[in-house]
Amino acid sequence: MAGNFWQSSHYLQWILDKQDLLKERQKDLKFLSEEEYWKLIFFTNVIQALGEHLKLRQQVIATATVYFKRFYARYSLKSIDPVLMAPTCVFLASVEEFGVVSNTRLIAAATSVLKTRFSYAFPKEFPYRMNHILECEFYLLELMDCCLIVYHPYRPLLQYVQDMGQEDMLLPLAWRIVNDTYRTDLCLLYPPFMIALVID
């Protein structure tokens, strides 16, 4: 990981201005209602469930969520099916942060998670195969200009809580709140240390 956040692609390319983000969203809101746009929150839950099913660390899941949000910050929800983009982001994040999740495990996990946890929204089988995910990965990498480094609020949060001297009491709750921030646009709008500081 790059040693300096202020010189990283995360800061230089992916801390977005709120007005620019809203302007990009207006394209979608011409065709989708605000409620339909909440699908972004729903799919962060899908990514979380998929990562948990694969037993990935929370940082890998958070990275996948950031990749997902970056893609849909620049492209419409109609450009690529979020059902395909969610496991693609998990796959790419696992490669970047953890080590490759096998093709069969990823497809089996996506099928299982959609069938068991989200069957109310997806009554059919998971329609994609690994070749679709690998093709989608190219689109994702192209959009992000291969800038895969993501800084997270976890490390600064840990430092802030340690400085306060109340680790046992504060850290579990603060960690869960950080996880919940990934359902919002905060990871696109603010540096991670600011998110951690606000939570602390």
List the model feature ranges, each with a label.
Residues 1-59:
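A eukaryotic "domain-start" boundary segment
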Residues 35-198:
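Structured all-alpha helical bundle cores of eukaryotic regulatory proteins
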